[in-house]
C-alpha cells in the first residue's frame, strides 16, 4: 500500500514536470528544458522501477495510471498559471475603433491596424502581440470596448523586431540601471 501511495505521489510530481519540459521545448527554451528533464528522468526511473518490481501488484499499476491522469490535470493547471511565452490575437472589427487601439497601446500592448475588404464593406483587423500572462487583461479590454469583435489567436514560437522587442529592451536597461544604482 505504501508503494502504491509513493507511485501515485511520484506521478503527480513527474507528469507536471513532463508537461513543463515539453512546453519549454516547444517554446525553444532548450537549456531550461534540459535542466527540467534531469529531474523528470530521475522521478520516471524510480516510479517505473517500483512498478516493474512486481507486475502482479495491481495496486501499484492502478496508482501509476491514476497518478498519471491526476498529474496531467495538475500539469495543465500549472502551465496555465505560468503562461510561458507570447500570443498573437487577430481582432476583426466593423469600424476602426480608435478607442480600442488607443486603450490597448496605453496599456502597453503592441497593436498594428490593417484595413481590408469584406464582402459588403471595409473591415479592420488588429494584430496584437502580448505575453500569455497578460492574455486575460487583453481580452477584458477588447470585450469591454468591442464586445462584438471576432477574435482568433495563436501562440508565437519566436519573433524579431517591433514594438514588443523595443519595450523589452527598455525594461532590461532600466533593470540594469536599478541594479547598478543599489
Curated annotation (Swiss-Prot):
The chain crosses the membrane at residues 6-26, 32-52, 58-78. Keywords: Cell membrane, Membrane, Transmembrane, Transmembrane helix. One of its GO terms (cellular component) is plasma membrane. It is a multi-pass membrane protein. The keyword Transmembrane helix applies. It is found in: Cell membrane. PANTHER family: UPF0316 PROTEIN YEBE. Belongs to the UPF0316 family. This is UPF0316 protein BCQ_3166. It comes from Bacillus cereus (strain Q1).
Amino acid at each position: 500500500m505504501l508503494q502504491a501511495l509513493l507511485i501515485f505521489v511520484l506521478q503527480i510530481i513527474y507528469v507536471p514536470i513532463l508537461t513543463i519540459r515539453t512546453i519549454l521545448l516547444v517554446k525553444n527554451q532548450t537549456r531550461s528544458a534540459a535542466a527540467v528533464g534531469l529531474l523528470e528522468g530521475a522521478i520516471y526511473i524510480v516510479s517505473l522501477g517500483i512498478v516493474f518490481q512486481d507486475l502482479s501488484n495491481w495496486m501499484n499499476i492502478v496508482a501509476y495510471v491514476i497518478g498519471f491522469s491526476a498529474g496531467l490535470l495538475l500539469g495543465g493547471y500549472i502551465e496555465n498559471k505560468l503562461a510561458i511565452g507570447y500570443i498573437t490575437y487577430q481582432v476583426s472589427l466593423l469600424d476602426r475603433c480608435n478607442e480600442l487601439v488607443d486603450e490597448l497601446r496605453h496599456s502597453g500592448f503592441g497593436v498594428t491596424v490593417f484595413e481590408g475588404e469584406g464582402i459588403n464593406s471595409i473591415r479592420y483587423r488588429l494584430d496584437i502581440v502580448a505575453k500569455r500572462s497578460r492574455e486575460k487583461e487583453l481580452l477584458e479590454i477588447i470585450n469591454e470596448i468591442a464586445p462584438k469583435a471576432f477574435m482568433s489567436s495563436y501562440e508565437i514560437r519566436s519573433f524579431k523586431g517591433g514594438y514588443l522587442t523595443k519595450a523589452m529592451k527598455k525594461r532590461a536597461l532600466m533593470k540594469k540601471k536599478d541594479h547598478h544604482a543599489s
